[in-house]
A protein has these predicted regions:
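Amphipathic coiled-coil/heptad-repeat helices and related helical stalk/stem segments
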Residues: 42, 63, 191-192, 223
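Hydrophobic alpha-helix immediately C-terminal to the catalytic Tyr-X-X-X-Lys motif of short-chain
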Residues: 157, 161, 165, 195, ...
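N-terminal Rossmann-like NAD(P)+-binding domain of SDR-like oxidoreductases, especially those catalyzing
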Residues: 1-181, 231, 311, 315, ...
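C-terminal substrate-binding subdomain of Rossmann-fold SDR/epimerase-dehydratase oxidoreductases
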Residues: 16-19, 199-334
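Conserved GTPase G-domain signal focused on the G5
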Residues: 185
Length: 334
């Protein structure tokens, strides 16, 4: 099959593209290669995707004409949409980047799928859509009407837009709410990367909400396994579904939403302890108040995902952090 993987130079997109290539698929990857973080890291990921079955095009999702041309020329079987302007905190200062990439860019993906009869669109949503929810674990049955960041609002909007296109045009869509993904080849703006860099340089790390936070940290290999399994299960329309009695994660249209998380929330301080053990050094900690747009805790109910594909993430934080540190030291030749 021929896949489009958006954000192919990004953390998750790179790993997904690599897995699809290993399984013998043809993959077209796109990425705008922006400088939100180190472009050389993005290029290094792309270099590892070198294969006759992989073709890369530098393209911005918001380029309406370029995206339409790409879809018309390639006639993809399936689309795995992972490109987005990421980061909760960055959205506080750079809101228009999120409107361009996460809203207009996403509309171009939907239009491409519509006009070329793509058989399945799988797209990245986010655990951030749960916003002010306090009930744990977060379930796809819960309300997601109270986001606390613009990033989260754009991800919720993506789910709504997907439903509209599934309803109007019969496009099968599956949204995946990722929970704090980490691992080798990760993003430099994420905590594990920043903490590792600071500790190896002898600098202190900023610990928000004085360490009193929990995250459902999910290792990249587990994310990849789940995504690859999910893309093979194409949602079907369900004429018996109703708003009154049906799940909000499904529809009468061929539309589904799932959580992908480890289902084992970890205290931030325990995450830091795992990093200290992997590095063999103690972190100097700046204890800070919580940042605007952050939530205290996240935890994923992944039973519906397990019911669908028979898989639950397995990797412990201790193992995952150790793997990240080994990659980091090798990549930066430390």
């Amino acid at each position: 099959m021929k896949f489009l993987v958006t954000g192919a130079a990004g953390f998750i997109g790179f790993h997904i593209a690599q897995r699809l290539l290993n399984e013998g698929h043809d993959v077209v990857g796109i990425d705008n290669m922006n400088d939100y973080y180190d472009v050389s890291l993005k290029q290094a990921r792309l270099d590892r995707l070198s294969s006759p079955a992989f073709h890369f095009q530098q393209l911005d999702l918001a380029d309406r004409e370029g995206m339409a041309t790409l879809f018309a020329a390639e006639q993809f079987d399936r689309v795995i949409h992972l490109a987005a302007q990421a980061g909760v905190r960055y959205s506080l200062e750079n809101p228009y980047a999120y409107a361009d990439g996460n809203l207009m860019g996403y509309l171009n993906i939907l239009e491409g799928c519509r006009h070329t009869k793509v058989k399945h669109l799988v797209y990245a949503s986010s655990s951030s859509v749960y916003g002010l929810n306090r009930k744990m674990p977060f379930s796809t049955e819960d309300s997601v009407d109270h986001p606390v960041s613009l990033y989260a609002a754009t991800k919720k909007a993506n789910e709504l837009m997907a439903h509209t296109y599934s309803h109007l045009y019969g496009i099968p869509t599956t949204g995946l709410r990722f929970f704090t993904v980490y691992g080798p080849w990760g993003r430099p703006d994420m905590a594990l990367f920043k903490f590792t860099k600071a500790m190896l340089a002898g600098k202190s790390i900023d610990v928000y909400n004085y360490g009193k936070m929990k995250r459902d940290f999910t290792y990249i290999d587990d994310i990849v396994e789940a995504v690859v399994r999910v893309q093979d299960v194409i949602p079907q329309a369900n004429a018996d579904w109703t708003v009154e009695s049906g799940s909000p994660a499904t529809s009468s249209a061929p539309y589904r939403v799932y959580n992908i998380g480890n289902s084992s929330p970890v205290e931030l301080m325990d995450y830091i302890t795992a990093l200290e053990e992997a590095l063999g050094m103690e972190a100097k900690k700046n204890m800070m108040p919580i940042q605007p747009g952050d939530v205290l805790d996240t935890s994923a109910d992944t039973q519906p995902l397990y019911d669908l594909v028979g898989f639950k993430p397995q990797t412990s934080v201790k193992e995952g952090v150790k793997n990240f540190v080994e990659w980091y030291k090798d990549y930066y030749q430390i």
